[in-house]
Amino acid sequence: MFSLISFTRQWASVYKPMQHGRKDARGRVRKRFMCIENIAQLANFAKELQSAESPFVAVETNIGGTLTERFMSPEYNVYFFVMGKGKLQDNDGEDADTKQEAMEHAVKFLMYLRQHKEEVNAKGMGMDGASMIDTDNVRFETFGPFMNRWFCVGISLFGLEKMGCINPDDYVSQEGQEEKE
């Protein structure tokens, strides 16, 4: 089954600017991927943010969305962080460049996800979950600066899942309840 968290972790490990999980020149393992509850709770992952390397990607584990009569449309949020250069006061437009770099990482992630969807569809693998994510209509927003001059671009991906029917095995039958009483 498709998991956006696993997919994003795998992307971060093969994407050259990140190479999550591989050793750097000093022999340290590069941490370029993390899960966060949500972007509003930056304080909860501030310690990890201070030790993270630029660029890195984070997936929000809280999921929102909408339910209609027959469909569920979950919203998934992915954030692409880049450390700004220079001092906050003397940036001379560097903040805009940093945000643009974060946006470039987000676009490359979306292209990779689209390619995965096309491969799944071409192989006739059915609906693996990735095919249910709309990569044509993506909302994005910039955030920052955070501590140590971090900036990020957050993207919101929307899914569409058909809700199934009631499974009678999930419930106690009427006869079963009457026997108890």
What is each residue range found by the language model?
Residues 35-37, 87-91, 135:
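A generic structural signal for ordered alpha-helices
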Residues 6, 70-75, 82-114:
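Extracellular/virion structural assembly segments
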Residues 1-71, 121, 170-171, 179-181:
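Small/polar-rich, solvent-exposed N-terminal microdomains that initiate assembly or binding
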Residues 72-87, 147-163:
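Oligomerization/assembly interface segments of phage tail-like spikes and tubes
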Residues 152, 157-181:
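C-terminal tail/extension regions appended to the core domain(s) of diverse proteins
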Residues 20-24, 99-160:
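Acidic-leaning, charged glycine-interspersed low-complexity segments
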Residues 59, 103, 133-135, 169, ...:
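Intrinsic disorder/low-complexity signal
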